[in-house]
Amino acid sequence: HADEVVTSWGRETIHVYSEEQVGEILKSLENEEEYGDILRAKGMVKGEDGTWIYFDMVPGEYEVRTGAPEYTGRICVIGAKINEEKLEKLFGL
């Protein structure tokens, strides 16, 4: 993949998620045809119960955990041939 241009897609969001939703989203990012060649995704979003959900994803593995409260949710996706429109739909933005 050395010849592919790596870009990043980032958004701030007040959208509320469940831990299950975040896990499903991260699993979906493995679909290269749909979303692009995703190398990394990370961020923090507000959880349904008022907690904050932090997530990290690299191809083949991801982690979802709770963490310190933040002012606003932030999502960052890094990869090649990123389909921004499909990412916005996936994250419900």
Task: Name each model-derived stretch.
Residues 77:
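Flexible loop/N-cap segments at domain edges
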Residues 1-70, 80-93:
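C-terminal accessory "lid"/substrate-recognition subdomains
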